[in-house]
Amino acid sequence: MLVPIEFWQEAARWLRAVKPDLFLLAEAEEDYLFDRAFDASYAWRLYHLMNDVAQQKCRVDRIREYLYADRKHVPAWALRLMFTSNHDENSWSGSEFVRLGPAVRVMTALTFLLPQSLPLVYTGQEFGYDHSFAFFDRDPLPACEPNETTEFYRRLIALRHDAPALASGERGGSFVEIRN
């Protein structure tokens, strides 16, 4: 992170004095960001692992290793913004369909089901819109009708809403691996 944590700690203190329930999200992943500053941070390592697994550059057990390592380094209440696409990656690296291919739904489900997850649904994903947006130019989303992908997202959101174990942070269940 380019801005020292001391700045963010002081800023968070001042901001929360005005609005105690303020939620602060860091577009970075360093573990120290949760030290009296941010409530959530981007899960960049997980994002890159999901892409690598989908492209068969590494084994899926690397995701499990990430989860165990992350649990050791961040508070139980901390959240990770988990995503298969965002404004940067969609523009520069291609849509989730290009990067994840046939694994797009599995990886999307992971962002909703993993512990400490704060799932991000990026522009058009709820319609299955396969398009890389221009980063610096106007590139509007066309009108989209609900479809099979919309229903997939609705089901994930409903599952997350209806299952207390899938709640974020300390309100949710624990990550327990069942080995077979």
Feature annotation, model-predicted:
Residues L24, P119-L120:
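Hydrophobic/aromatic residues located in beta-strands of well-ordered beta-sheets
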Residues P102-V106:
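Conserved interdomain hinge at the start of the Helicase C-terminal
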